[in-house]
Every structure is written in structure tokens, then in C-alpha cells.
């Protein structure tokens, strides 16, 4: 198992019957580490995995299906990063702050994946179709409620959650768009 320069964990496995979908997702994440989502093609993905283009279409009927799967995988990785950061900080308020810093750092380490997750219409459709799926936003929002001392689901918890998410998401986007420098000290101070 390796970690690419953009912090997404990637298992190195050669393709064999039965795991082509997983291999396509892993290679798709690698491609996103190199290029923006718009330039990713199913044909290029097939070439890099070493399979024919038609075999890709058995798992992903179109580019949108692949992008949705990559966004879903990105959300899982972001949620895992946030959980790990919260646990490492000992939970509570320190853990909550750590989840925010993990969110921003994930965005900086995985800019194309982060933009795919949060700026494409795919994620809204994914969330509508998978409301029970745990994901990064759910983790951050639940921690915001706990940190604010509010009962989960209450108006106070919702307000705290939206404020927390807006802060870290806005900071991440400002840095990604070049409006602010990627400065660890600033991220630590704000989050």
C-alpha cells in the first residue's frame, strides 16, 4: 500500500478477474492527482489499468458514473482523515478543531478530488441517493453540534454545523483558488 503525494491511500495490486472496478477507482484517483477531473477519460483510464475500453464500461457506463464513484471514495477518505485527526487530538473541542484542519489539509493535498466532491452536481445526486451513507460532512457536522454543546438535530446544532462547515470549506476554497497562501500556521489559527 502506498500514499500518493496527495494523501489518498492507494493499494498497489495488479488487475485480476474480480477487482476491475476497484482497480479503476484506484487508477482514477491517481489520474485526479495528476489532472483536473475534466481531463480524465475512460479510454485513458482503461489504457493505464491495462484493459480494453469496453471492459471499463461494464463497471462505469459513462464518465459521470466513474466521477460519482471517485467522489464517493474521496468522501470516505476525507471522513477517515477527519476521524483519525479527531481521535489523535483526544476528541472533544480539540478533536473538533482537528477535524476542521484535516478538512482543509485534505483539500490542499487533493485539489482535483476535493473540487470534484464539492463543486460538481454529482455529489448532490449522490447524497440524495445515499442519505444513510456516513461521509465527511456528516462527521464534521455531528462534531460541530457536540462542540457547541447542542443536542444533535436541534436548531443550535444545525447553526453550529453550518458555521463550522462554511468556515473550513471557505478557507479551503480561498487557498485552492489562490486568494490566500497555503500556510499551516494560518490553518491552525483559524481552525
Language model: regions and residue ranges:
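Short, hydrophobic secondary-structure boundary micro-motifs
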Residues: 41, 115-117, 125-126, 177, ...
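Amphipathic alpha-helical linker/stalk segments
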Residues: 12, 72-98, 130-136, 140-142
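Amphipathic alpha-helical packing segments from all-alpha helical-bundle domains
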Residues: 125-150, 155-163, 188-191
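Helix-turn-helix
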Residues: 23, 27, 31-65, 69
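N-terminal intrinsically disordered/low-complexity leader segments
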Residues: 1-19, 30, 89
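Short hydrophobic clusters on alpha-helical segments that form packing/core surfaces
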Residues: 24-32, 74, 78, 103
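Helical hydrophobic small-molecule/effector-binding pocket
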Residues: 97-118, 126-131, 165
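Amphipathic C-terminal alpha-helical segment
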Residues: 146, 165-183
Amino acid at each position: 500500500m502506498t500514499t500518493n503525494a496527495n494523501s489518498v491511500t492507494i493499494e498497489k495490486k495488479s488487475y485480476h478477474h474480480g477487482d476491475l472496478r476497484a482497480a479503476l477507482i484506484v487508477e482514477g484517483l491517481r489520474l485526479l492527482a495528476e489532472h483536473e477531473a475534466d481531463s480524465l477519460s475512460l479510454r485513458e483510464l482503461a489504457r493505464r489499468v491495462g484493459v480494453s475500453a469496453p471492459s471499463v464500461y461494464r463497471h462505469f457506463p459513462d464518465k459521470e458514473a466513474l466521477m460519482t464513484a471517485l467522489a464517493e471514495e474521496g468522501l470516505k477518505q476525507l471522513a477517515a482523515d477527519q476521524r483519525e485527526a479527531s481521535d489523535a487530538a483526544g476528541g472533544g473541542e480539540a478533536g473538533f478543531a482537528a477535524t476542521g484542519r484535516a478538512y482543509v489539509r485534505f483539500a490542499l493535498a487533493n485539489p482535483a478530488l476535493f473540487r470534484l466532491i464539492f463543486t460538481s452536481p454529482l455529489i448532490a445526486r449522490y447524497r440524495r441517493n445515499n442519505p444513510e451513507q456516513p461521509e465527511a460532512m456528516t462527521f464534521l457536522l455531528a462534531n460541530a453540534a457536540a462542540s457547541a454543546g447542542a443536542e444533535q438535530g436541534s436548531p443550535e446544532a444545525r447553526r453550529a454545523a453550518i458555521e463550522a462547515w462554511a468556515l473550513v470549506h471557505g478557507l479551503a476554497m480561498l487557498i485552492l483558488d489562490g486568494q490566500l497562501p497555503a500556510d499551516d500556521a494560518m490553518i491552525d489559527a483559524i481552525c
